[in-house]
Amino acid sequence: MNGIMTTSSHSNFYNQDLVGAPSSSDHIPGPSSQDQPTNNNSPQHHHQHDQSQTTHQNHPLNQPIHHHPTQQNQSESQQSRQSHHLQQQQQQQQQQQQNQHNQQNLASSSTSYEMPSIYQQFTGSYQQTRVPKNFLLENANYYTLQPGFPLVQAADYYSTPTTTSANDYQNSTINSIISPSFQMGSVSTPDTQNSSIRSKQQQQHSYQQQQPQQLSQSQHQSQVPDIFYTQGGTIGGYVTTKQQQKEFSRKTSGDQTLVPQTNSKLQQQISETSYSQQQQQQQSPPTPQKQQQQQHYQHQTTQPYGGTGFMLYSQTGGPSSSPVAGNISIPTTIATTGQPNSQFQFTYGSPQQGSSSKTNQMYLYQRQQQQQQQHQQPQSQQMSQISQLSQQIPPQGSSKNISINSTPTKSRASSITTRSGRQSRSTSISSFIPQPDYPERVIRPKVATTRWDDENTNCYQVRARNILVSRREDTNYINGTKLLNVIGMTRGKRDGILKTEKIKNVVKVGSMNLKGVWIPFDRAYEIARNEGVDSLLYPLFVKNIKQYFLTKGHKLKSEDDEQEILEEGMTRQREEVRREGRSNGVGDFHNEEEEEIVGIQEDAGPNTAENDVPGDDEEEEDDDDDDDDDEEEGEQDDEEEEDGSSTSMSSSKNSESKLLETRDVIKSIVEEGDSTTGNVSEVKYVHEYLERSPQSTAIKEEDLYYGSSHNTPLTVHKTL
């Protein structure tokens, strides 16, 4: 015994000044009352009292004890010496266990994550310096009863266990009011985490003898396998950031299926506990509580972050700003994870560093219980549950071991889901937008509008035979000069018709499409209808052309499409003519063509002669300046027409000579017979050659644009 006085580390040392707090002598069993009054101050009985106190430590605390009145007169020096003596015994036991555990770790260490020997020695010395850390939980609930510590936990997460030990734990006062600072201090200390399985069980047995109030807590501790207590432990709950990063990267690395074979004892314990739990599940019939737990488990798997139960905050109305220690361990049942027959203990704080084998074994233990629960369900439910878990649950164990340190993974997963949700929304919206099928080439519309700035109006233009015929929007006047050009009239006839018009508007300044003599709508429609070009100029003569242009103008075909239609019609006519020529004979067909050519040549002469007469009449009759300008233009056009007639005569003679030359060849082909395929092909070739000749095309265009001032193709073949 030391003669030096030291401060007591007993918890009653802090409770002596409190009102209603029991003294330390109430819980210390003394010797018999006969020897105590006489031998109270002798040094021998000090030694006897120490022996009696050590022998009577197995006496339960909640058992009624009858003390002698003189027992309360014990001095405070005896209390301090006794408590110091107990403290030294506890420290010696802790040092022995620490040394044994260090030797075991050095002997059986095979992984790269175990703690070095220097760090373990530091833990032992650090525990010696932190003497007031080992509290005896006699008045542990005092701090929770004060108004400054309203730490009432959510009782919903502790109401579903079905085992007897869980019921004992449920009936205890710790379920309703939990002290986060002193709840599991003597059970989940770093010493017990550092010890092996057997030493931990022995130490739990000694704690049960000293404090039987912790019976339910020790039962809860004995059910938890050692895989949740990593080697090395934590120093008073303080973990460095590097160790946290290592643990976090180890959890998220994904190497959860590889379990080392070093810890054979732990694997045996896992198999034994799983086998005993399987037997209990087979013996006990399915109760409605289990069915509710299974439904709750499926709901939690479908919504892993839906509820706040994983964060273990108070939901019963208590303030959320209550102080919580950093190294507390909150016992939670597996009601949230759907495993009723086992209880786990998660740390509400920094993660514990340790070897990767124990974390992998923790995941293996959970997977074994998942497989047991799945085998009890029907096969169809098992397949559906596997599909749901594979689609919706992140890596195994992440939704079941959620602490504050797993919030980075939660936020990362939520950000991924929101990002994918935004992508899915964008694709779904774009899928409903109608995608117009654009044509392969841009089609020029048949009806177009142009701005006439000089007249301050708009004009609608319709293209026919490569000529634009315009119509004013304000007065509906139509350019008669362009209209007569589409009809194909000569210069003289056109000028004669336009001069006889009573209502007209002569335009000499502007673009080529807008120059000419403008006549009213009714007169222009009458001329077009009489000449048969009203359908060709559609929709120029629609009454409400503005509304038609806005509604149906874009649907009209362009000039190119119109030319394609005309070419198709011409090819059909050619095929019909070929069929008729084969049936009647090729010679007769060419004779008919020659007769047509001769008729055209005979008609060309008098037409050119007649074109000079209106020009002379106009010079004699009209005296206006406009008429004089028209006369000059008419004279120039007449000269061009004479040149055109001469070229047409020469071209017709050349074509006639060529046709006469090829007549003998065609007759020889016809005499040989049309039955052979080669002869038929030769006939077709000759016929197509004659049609492709420039003379025949010139004749057709002469027939089409006869007497017009715009029949420029007739002047192209002067070199022939």
Swiss-Prot record:
One of its GO terms (molecular function) is sequence-specific DNA binding. Residues 613-644 have a biased composition (Acidic residues). Residues 1-15, 22-35, 181-200, 254-266, 313-336, 400-413 have a biased composition (Polar residues). Residues 71-105, 201-223, 267-304, 366-399, 414-433, 645-654 have a biased composition (Low complexity). It is found in: Nucleus. InterPro entries: EFG1/Phd1/StuA, HTH_APSES_sf, KilA/APSES_HTH, Tscrpt_reg_HTH_APSES-type. It comes from the Eukaryota. Gene3D superfamilies: Transcription regulator HTH, APSES-type DNA-binding domain. Residues 480-501 bind DNA. One of its GO terms (cellular component) is nucleus. Residues 446-552 form the HTH APSES-type domain. Residues 569-582 have a biased composition (Basic and acidic residues). Pfam families: KilA-N. Keywords: DNA-binding, Nucleus, Transcription, Transcription regulation, Virulence. Residues 1-111, 181-223, 245-336, 365-437, 569-662 are annotated as: Disordered. Disruption phenotype: Exhibits increased colonization of the murine intestinal tract, a model of commensal colonization. One of its GO terms (biological process) is biological process involved in interaction with host. Transcription factor that regulates filamentous growth through repression of EFG1. Regulates the level of colonizing fungi, favoring commensalism as opposed to candidiasis. Belongs to the EFG1/PHD1/stuA family. This is Transcriptional regulator EFH1.
